[in-house]
UniProtKB/Swiss-Prot annotation:
The keyword Disulfide bond does not apply. Its EC number is 1.1.1.108. NAD(+) binds at residues 7-12. It catalyses: carnitine + NAD(+) = 3-dehydrocarnitine + NADH + H(+). It is an enzyme of class 1 (oxidoreductase). Gene3D superfamilies: N-(1-d-carboxylethyl)-l-norvaline Dehydrogenase, domain 2, NAD(P)-binding Rossmann-like Domain. Catalyzes the NAD(+)-dependent oxidation of L-carnitine to 3-dehydrocarnitine. GO terms for cellular component: cytoplasm. Keywords: Cytoplasm, NAD, Oxidoreductase. Transmembrane segments: none annotated. The keyword Oxidoreductase applies. Belongs to the 3-hydroxyacyl-CoA dehydrogenase family. L-carnitine dehydrogenase subfamily. This is L-carnitine dehydrogenase.
Amino acid sequence: MKFAVVGTGVIGSGWITRMLAHGHEVIATDPSEGAYERMLTQVKQNWPYAEQMGLAENASIQNLTFTPHLEEAVKDADHIQENVPEVEEIKDAVLKEIDFYAKPEATIGSSTSGIMPSELQANLSHPERLVVAHPFHPVYILPLVEIVPGKQTSEETTVKAEQIYESIGMDVLHVRHEIEGHIADRLMEALWRESLHIVNDGIATTEEVDKAFTHAAGLRYAQYGPFMTFHLAGGEGGMRHMLKQFGPALKKPWTKLIAPELTDDLYHKVVSGSEASSQGYTMSELDQKRNEFLIKVKELAEQYWPSDSKAMKKSNGAELQ
């Protein structure tokens, strides 16, 4: 299969690494000055982690080509992944150009983290072949991709897209109804907003908030999500007991959810605290530590709770009809 990647920043380079690691040809495009050099540097930096996770027999960085011209990149591609800045006007213009030059049978995935697919489809001539395919950084390590069809997406496109992403080792999460932020980012945003309130109100520092998560819930969430975590919290009675005993606590004011005003004082607290927590490491060094940690955690989690995208979709389908 031949992939085209439009936009070669952090997310785009992550997609490129994953596609190459699974033995596919990739042609990338980005009109910004110095894009090729930055992309190649990033992919080469990512490659050792892809090697740790296992490469396809014919995987090679030599399967990557680059062109500054979008038409040349997408015209022969079987699947096109768009990763341009999260600005609707920019995405709209680029997607219209992709739609115009792509061959009829090609599918298009947008990496948007928050824009709904129906909005992205609005001005396309072939809206039925677009889905949102939202990944998580680092794309070459984290396997989840949220597939969100729009109002005009065909069932054929959705099925085909899921198969394509599974072919590059992704765990597909089919989002039934489009919503701003999809699923995972909405969950992370709730935690982020509450964290800002705690720092803003002087209850804890950024380091203490991070510790509260990494030394407790973060360790559990590496294996189980919130529902399985609370299911276990109910003891032998599981979730039934947990909801009966702790359900009333949902009425308590334990969360604010609405984000606090980002004042100069809060800005200073968050920035200075985060920089202090970096302990002098450069961002590149922190990236390396994170990547090595994620690979080991992912391998460990697989031993105790094997991920299976097909089982995930089957389970989800059984819950809501």
